[in-house]
Amino acid sequence: MPEKEKDPQDPLREILAMLEREIAERPPTIGVVGVSGVGKSSTINSLFRTSLATSGTVARTKEFEDVDLSVRFNAPLAADSSEKSSGPGESPVAPQTNAPTRVLLRVVDAPGLGEDLALDDRYLEQYLENLPRCDVVLWVMSARNRAIALDQMYLQKLSRFYDKIVFGINQVDLVEPMDWHTGYNIPSREQEANIKAISQDRLEHLASAIGRKPALLYYSSRYGYRLEHLFKALLDACPENRRWIYAGLKNFSHLDFIPAETQQKLVFRATRRLAQMLSKSDHR
């Protein structure tokens, strides 16, 4: 009896199953930290369409809280063995189109530092205990608060995590003269100039504190402004030995969390298109 021909997709399925097992055992994990009142939980809610408790008057997060999300993952698969192998001096054969699946993305919401001196030691212990399991850490700051001495002080105590920190300046919609263009979801010219001045000032102070130029982005969790830039910066900051996991998330953005019916609305499409045009002009 002739031997049954093997399905060429079997090895690919095995690879995909192996990737899924690895991710299930140690899911990609993003920590969100910072001093109290800067909008950490609201940032998570805006980025990932969650519903963590938030408050503008009292601190809500008292312990590290894991938020588990199911997201699309494009697993990189090897090139089809039937294709011609590349010879000496030739470019390597391009991999097959990625195979989409669903995986767990873990977001860790941290209690705010600086809320109460009596709590700081306990919170710092929690930071030291939980941050090692995070692949990348978003350190949230507020655009409204020019004083960053607290951030600098806590950063000194968490120096072992510098390599995995991305700094985010939240609440830019509240920067003077507070004339945000809600119809287009962009700041006014004067407001944008002030936002960029604040960002440059923070960049210089943070570079002085950690001894290197940090990854820093400004955004508004309230309006969802520049969240896609923020999310991609987090993916880019992942550790090298975990990069293969985050490479599968590269084609995924915060827009994937927005319901399809919302994305089809004319105002939403127009706003997104305008944001893309402005983003391109910023990089010219």
Regions found by a protein language model. Give the residues of each.
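Canonical P-loop GTPase G-domain recognition
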Residues: 173-248
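P-loop NTP-binding site
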Residues: 219-222, 231-243, 249-284
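Switch II of P-loop NTPase G domains
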Residues: 79-137, 141-157
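Conserved protein kinase catalytic core
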Residues: 52, 115-116, 148, 176-177, ...
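Conserved G1/Walker A P-loop phosphate-binding module
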Residues: 1-110
